[in-house]
């Protein structure tokens, strides 16, 4: 798939209204392209599997869906989660905000996906516009334990990142059969449903998580990211991560251009439906790219 989204002159995008018009055309094209995938890649779901979905119209593709490990002895191996590999090579698990019916399988997925230490990125508030968007799936009090069979989840620390008030970080310890794993949970609450967040805060957070994800403790684990449905905001985060990977890599042989964005989003959508869902989210990616190409500095937040 190839789009010529926005013309540039000296690395600067055309006016915002043109970007929005182009973004609308691209989203329309992506939606048409996705219809073909829906006809061939949707899984056949049992009633038990369907009960684990937050939204009936957002499900993983059969060829990219996460399957629960047989060690859990679940009657159904289904969870609403997709394995997504971005062009620069990093692997994500894009998933829905857990429901009361899927909290247990969510943590089982986390355990089986993370060798030693892992990262969860939460991009939705629990409630938005008076609607439940995500259930509380973690122990709330310090040192409280959530038990899921022989798997336990313990909250060991809560803190914020300096200069990013929208982010709360929780550290969990997972225990199973004497083996312990560390999970860092980044809760970003500055993103409106279907809209776009403040550029500085999300870009700074994404760059921080990108740096952390390549550190020795985390580099082999996929980044687990969710919003409510696990598509719009989740896809935008993954696209932003890829844009940063291309623009931050001084060794890259190919220069990043805004024309790459549509292909990045198309790649994501081929693995998780509706990744980057709205025109505003696509415009946000253009805006960030423009600021990066103009050399604007975004400092890493500190603990």
Swiss-Prot record:
One of its GO terms (molecular function) is protein tyrosine phosphatase activity. Its EC number is 3.1.3.48. It comes from the Eukaryota. It comes from Schizosaccharomyces pombe (strain 972 / ATCC 24843). It is found in: Cytoplasm. It catalyses: O-phospho-L-tyrosyl-[protein] + H2O = L-tyrosyl-[protein] + phosphate. The lineage of its organism: Eukaryota, Fungi, Dikarya, Ascomycota, Taphrinomycotina. It is an enzyme of class 3 (hydrolase). InterPro entries: Prot-tyrosine_phosphatase-like, Protein-Tyr_Phosphatase, PTP_cat, Tyr_Pase_AS, Tyr_Pase_cat, Tyr_Pase_dom. Contributes to dephosphorylation of tyrosine 15 of cdc2. The active site is at 227 (phosphocysteine intermediate). Residues 24-292 form the Tyrosine-protein phosphatase domain. Belongs to the protein-tyrosine phosphatase family. Non-receptor class subfamily. GO terms for cellular component: cytosol; nucleus. Keywords: Cell cycle, Cell division, Cytoplasm, Hydrolase, Mitosis, Protein phosphatase. SMART domains: PTPc (SM00194), PTPc_motif (SM00404). CDD domains: PTP_fungal. Pfam families: Y_phosphatase. This is Tyrosine-protein phosphatase 3. One of its GO terms (biological process) is signal transduction.
